[in-house]
From Swiss-Prot:
List of residues binding L-aspartate: 174, 220, 448, 489
UniProt GO MF annotations: aspartate-tRNA ligase activity; ATP binding; nucleic acid binding
Role of this protein: Catalyzes the attachment of L-aspartate to tRNA(Asp) in a two-step reaction: L-aspartate is first activated by ATP to form Asp-AMP and then transferred to the acceptor end of tRNA(Asp).
Keyword check for Glycosyltransferase: no
Organism: Xanthomonas campestris pv. campestris (strain B100)
Protein name: Aspartate--tRNA ligase
Enzyme Commission number(s) from the entry: 6.1.1.12
Keywords recorded for this protein, A-Z: Aminoacyl-tRNA synthetase, ATP-binding, Cytoplasm, Ligase, Nucleotide-binding, Protein biosynthesis
Annotated compartments: Cytoplasm
Residues reported in the UniProt entry to bind ATP: 220-222, 229, 482, 534-537
Family stated for the protein in its record: Belongs to the class-II aminoacyl-tRNA synthetase family. Type 1 subfamily.
Alphabetical list of PANTHER family matching this protein: ASPARTATE--TRNA LIGASE, MITOCHONDRIAL, ASPARTYL/LYSYL-TRNA SYNTHETASE
Length: 588
């Protein structure tokens, strides 16, 4: 139906007849001449219709051109010529196509929005097929496509084997809720959609496949936000007979090569490394954005004897923290703006936010200054490096809570004050805690997942020091986003059973839920490790968008709906009966 793509017509084709196909981006009837911007996936070219007196064919072509509306689908035949007025804004701006025939392949109904408009997200998702025609959306989807293609080429060339793992699998406690699928042939029993291929890829290592990868679809029934979806795509990788640095060095080289190939970005020749403890201490986050130079400063030692009870209590608590965040130039913040910062901190668990503001002349404005003597107050300011014109925020409470909300303030301040440096800041975060204590459940939970190996090989040591145990987990962070997470895995069945026990999973439950894994580990499992990268998140970073929904062709809303297909939707009683499911009426 076509000889060339619209966006690739150039001066080399001048004088030649071409056949194009695409959508009417804009049609302008100026009376004696019609201009059509014809668009396909490669771009736009101008089609010109000039009726010649006494020429029935050109008159008919003009009549068709004059009838066109937005997004009508056309086939155009014509001759390429140089444009009198060059348009430098488009790739084809030096040429135009003089139409000798226009065929309307399909008329478009009146549009809910035009390809060059940016309507509300719900409208975009309801008419996703129109949204995806927009040049910006085409660009972002192409970035994702190039990313996946480049990853496959890179891994295929290095002897990785692309192996599929099951989509219908067993429900296992991996953190988020499972999506459950009723098993028609086994009444009362259910499959689960995989939250990750974690256990299958480990079993592939036991089976002797040395290097595995998969572009895997994963499913988690969890609350949505800009960087989360119910279903998502990850690059899943596993290596046999490796230590942490083997995995990290390989994938660091891979990510560096992929960024250069896909978006022509040169990442650092060597990614910096930081332990989890250091990241939390300095940045209040296990995925710090190193483009922001602001750091947290611990001040507990200076406020242990403070008359301010909130500071003193946290400073004298073994699990407490008192941290300061200095914002250069922050003294310009009004009281309302300071209240906005306090409200932002409250979203992350802060019960209050203390501050000291120093005007350019050195005047102090602070609700906590009265609790300090002159010498202690001066020492506090000196310790945090405060200068005239600065504001210093303080957080006090449990270590993790303070780290969370002060880390969130750091990000907000960085953006509000223009302190986010341009460029790319990759980072390895290592030595994560093995466990964290769940106050509500009154038990340990795995910080990564239950299959991550501890740094110690001795089970008795792990049991005795579970609270402070360090794992062999690692994350790759880029500009404050965790783009990949992995670990060396447990390959001994006795260690795996011990970890289950520490997580409150008894022998009987472990056998019922993970018996297949324990059996596999019993038959000569090699030391192994791996990592998984979030394709959606990396594509969003490459494309320069904050929402992964922009790089997913058909995403769900934050309300977990597909507005285009109207999913989820009710199921007929007959279908439910076939899978032995009965839906209870909603509680009033």
């Amino acid at each position: 139906m076509r000889t060339h793509f619209c966006g690739l017509v150039d001066e080399t084709l001048i004088g030649q007849t071409v056949t194009l196909a695409g959508w009417t981006d804009v049609a302008r009837n100026l009376g004696g001449v019609c201009f059509i911007d014809l668009r396909d996936h490669e771009g736009i070219v101008q089609v010109t219709v000039e009726p010649a007196e006494g020429d029935a064919n050109s008159a008919e072509v003009f009549k068709v051109a004059a009838s066109l509306g937005y997004e009508d689908v056309l086939q155009v035949e014509g001759v390429v010529r140089a444009r009198h007025a060059v348009n430098d804004k488009i790739r084809t701006g030096k040429v135009e196509v003089i139409a000798t025939r226009i065929t309307i392949l399909n008329k478009a109904a009146p549009l809910p929005f035009h390809a060059h408009e940016n309507p509300g997200e719900d409208t975009r998702l309801k008419y996703r097929y129109l949204d995806l025609r927009r040049p910006e959306m085409q660009r972002m989807q192409r970035t994702r496509i190039k990313l996946v293609q480049a990853l496959r080429r890179h891994l295929d060339a290095r002897d990785f084997q692309d192996i599929e793992t099951p989509i219908l699998t067993k429900a296992t406690p991996e953190g988020a809720r499972d999506f459950l699928v009723p098993a028609r042939m086994h009444p009362g029993e259910f499959y689960a959609l995989p939250q990750s291929p974690q256990l299958f890829k480990q079993i592939l290592m036991v089976a002797g496949f040395d290097r595995y990868y998969q572009i895997a679809r994963c499913f988690r029934d969890e609350a949505l936000r800009a960087d989360r979806q119910l279903e998502f795509t990850q690059l899943d990788m596993e290596f046999a007979f490796v230590r942490e640095r083997d995995v990290q060095d390989f994938v660091e080289d891979m990510i560096r090569a992929i960024f250069k190939e896909v978006v022509d970005v040169e990442l650092a020749a060597q990614f910096p490394r930081m332990t989890w403890a250091e990241a939390m201490r300095r940045y209040g986050s296990d995925k710090p954005d190193l483009r922001i130079a602001l750091e947290l400063v611990d001040v507990a030692e200076l406020v242990k004897t403070s008359e301010f009870p909130v500071f003193a209590a946290a400073a004298n608590d073994a699990d407490g923290r008192v941290a300061a965040l200095r914002i250069p130039g922050g003294a310009t913040l009004s009281r309302k703006q300071i209240d906005d910062y306090a409200a932002h901190a409250a979203k992350y668990g802060a019960k209050g936010l203390a501050y000291i503001k120093l005007s350019e002349s050195g005047e102090v404005s602070s609700p906590i200054a009265k609790f300090f003597g002159e010498e202690a107050f001066a020492a506090l300011l000196a310790h945090v490096g405060a200068a005239n014109g600065d504001i210093v925020f303080f957080g006090a409470g449990s270590y993790n809570k303070v780290s969370d909300f002060m880390g969130a303030l750091r990000l907000k301040a960085g953006k509000d004050f223009g302190l986010v440096a341009a460029g790319w800041a990759p980072l390895w975060v290592t030595d994560f805690p093995m466990f964290e204590w769940d106050e509500e459940a009154q038990r340990y939970v795995a910080l990564h997942h239950p299959f991550t190996a501890p740094a110690v090989d001795d089970i008795a040591d792990l049991r005795a020091n579970a609270r402070t145990a360090v794992s062999r987990g690692y994350d790759m962070v880029l500009n404050g986003n965790e783009i990949g997470g992995g670990s060396i895995r447990i390959h001994r069945p006795d260690m795996q059973s011990a970890v289950f026990e520490l997580l409150g999973i008894g022998a009987e439950e472990a056998r019922a839920k993970f018996g297949f894994l324990l059996d596999a580990l019993n038959y000569g499992a090699p030391p192994h490790g791996g990592i998984a990268f979030g394709i959606d998140r990396i594509a969003a970073l490459m494309a320069g968008t904050e929402s992964i929904r922009d790089v997913i062709p058909f995403p769900k809303t934050t309300g977990a709906q597909d507005l285009m297909t109207d999913a989820p939707s009710p199921i007929a009683a007959e279908q439910l009966a076939e899978v032995h499911v009965q839906v209870r009426p909603k509680q009033a």
